[in-house]
Amino acid sequence: SASHVEIPLFGINLGTVGFLTEGEITNWQTIIDRLLADDYSMQDRMMIRGTVRTGDGKECRKRALNDIVISRAGFSRLIGLDVYVNGSFLNAYEGDGIIISTPTGSTGYNLSAGGPIVDPMARLMIITPVCPHSLTSKSIVLPSDAKVSIEIAKKRKTQDTEAIVSFD
């Protein structure tokens, strides 16, 4: 929610992986000293924007540094998602959902779902299906200026007709 302010972020690894974090919590004093001494470099990371349109016409617009995830609302059913890129149909996915990831987010949920790790300074997006009910569903890498549209497919009664969208 603070993405429009353009305040630099500094990642500190509090867990066990920390692919893109610059510091470890055990070195917090050194980190603070370097920041106060202007002894650091900055990287401009790509963000993605998304718009959620509900059935009753409401819209919600947000930005994400890591990813936008569309997932099923129910626990026991698949969700069908039709994906379009620049207005052209790309694929129909059935599964637990879809991740639209930035290069920064490629080492997070995207990686856990089997997606590729990409250079954090690259200008691209990754679409990765989450637990696809298919033998051939793989991640797709797109240019950063591609317009991705996703619609809930209503092909079978056993599919969810609602989704949960998260911006990270």
Please provide the spans of the model-predicted regions.
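Gly/Ser-rich helix-loop-strand patches that form or flank binding pockets
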Residues: 2-15, 19
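Short aromatic-centered micro-motifs
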Residues: 83, 105, 165
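Gly/Ser/Thr-rich active-site loops/lids in small-molecule metabolic enzymes
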Residues: 92-95, 100-136
